[in-house]
């Protein structure tokens, strides 16, 4: 199972921005882009040509991009094997799924011997990347709606026979459940990520204290030119994309009263509605221009 998002990525780095660009735009372009257009677009976002070429080399090595010359024009195409991973990423990044207090939990218990230490490390990273919290070394917990994803992950890592999945109601903890959840998911660290996202991007789509998400069928317009919207949206998604993997959408009973997550989820949705389409239009324009 190919990783969708590198949880250790440094947002804003050339490689991270290129990965974000590929995920946002390359499928919309038919899976291929001219080298010159790619360099131009990433330069607009603040990435030098040399840095973009180095980042492309890394993604070629990971099997994401493939050199492909068309009618004597040098370009890169998306590896077809990467499409399913990008689609899974779309679902996690752009579709927020919050758990209600009356919904079940998914627990995963596993036991791997020392001889399988590398696989054990990989499994832990995978569980973290799915939004599971660590109750103990071999017991992890997440909202019940992640059951199918973790089942696929266990099969993909060839450890399904070493793990047991439990679907249960709220665990009975000795301390208040919210205190236990804060430790299992390291909520202080996660809250800091949400707060930083708000700090960086709330100026682009200010939210009032009582604001509500706009209806899905509404069509708010960006106040930015398409070129500016492209830069804003690329950096915004690059900053945001890892958060939904470590924040599984915990219910109110598991969160502190001042939890910033819902405001940042709302902000990201607002930015998507205002910036995504003009950003897409800019990419299409540059990509279709003559070399």
What are these regions (language model features)?
Residues 1-21, 84:
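Short alpha-helical segments that sit at the start of domains
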Residues 29-41:
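Short acidic, hydrophobic short linear motifs in intrinsically disordered regions
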Residues 83-106:
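Short, amphipathic alpha-helical interaction segments positioned at domain boundaries
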Residues 63:
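Glycine-centered, phosphate/nucleic-acid-interacting loop/turn motifs that mediate DNA/RNA or nucleotide
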Residues 114-207:
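Mid-protein regulatory/catalytic core that forms ligand/cofactor-binding pockets
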Residues 179-291:
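C-terminal regulatory/effector modules of DNA-binding transcriptional regulators
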Residues 47-58:
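Short amphipathic alpha-helical interaction segments
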Residues 69-75:
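Short, Lys/Arg-rich nucleic-acid/phosphate-binding segment
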């Amino acid at each position: 199972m190919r990783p969708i998002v590198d949880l250790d990525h440094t947002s804003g780095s050339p490689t991270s921005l290129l990965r974000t660009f590929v995920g946002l735009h390359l499928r919309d372009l038919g899976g291929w882009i001219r080298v010159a257009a790619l360099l131009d677009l990433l330069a607009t976002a603040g990435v030098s040509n040399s840095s973009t070429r180095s980042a492309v080399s890394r993604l070629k090595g990971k099997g994401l991009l493939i050199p492909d010359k068309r009618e004597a024009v040098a370009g890169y195409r998306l590896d077809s094997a990467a499409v399913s991973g990008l689609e899974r990423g779309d679902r996690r990044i752009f579709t927020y799924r919050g758990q209600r207090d009356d919904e079940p939990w998914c627990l995963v218990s596993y036991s791997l011997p020392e001889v399988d230490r590398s696989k054990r490390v990989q499994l832990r990273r995978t569980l973290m990347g799915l939004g599971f919290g660590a109750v103990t070394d071999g017991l992890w917990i997440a909202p019940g709606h992640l059951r199918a994803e973790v089942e696929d992950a266990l099969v993909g890592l060839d450890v399904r026979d070493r793990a047991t999945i439990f679907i249960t109601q709220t665990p009975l903890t000795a301390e208040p459940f919210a205190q236990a959840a804060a430790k299992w998911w390291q909520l202080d660290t996660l809250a800091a990520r949400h707060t930083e996202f708000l700090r960086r991007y709330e100026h682009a789509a200010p939210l009032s204290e009582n604001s509500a998400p706009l209806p899905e069928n509404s069509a708010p317009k960006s106040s930015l030119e398409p070129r500016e919207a492209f830069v804003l949206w690329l950096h915004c998604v690059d900053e945001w994309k890892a958060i939904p993997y470590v924040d599984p959408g915990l219910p109110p009973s598991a969160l502190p009263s001042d939890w910033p997550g819902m405001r940042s989820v709302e902000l990201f949705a607002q930015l998507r509605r205002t910036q995504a389409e003009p950003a897409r239009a800019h990419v299409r324009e540059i990509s279709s221009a003559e070399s």
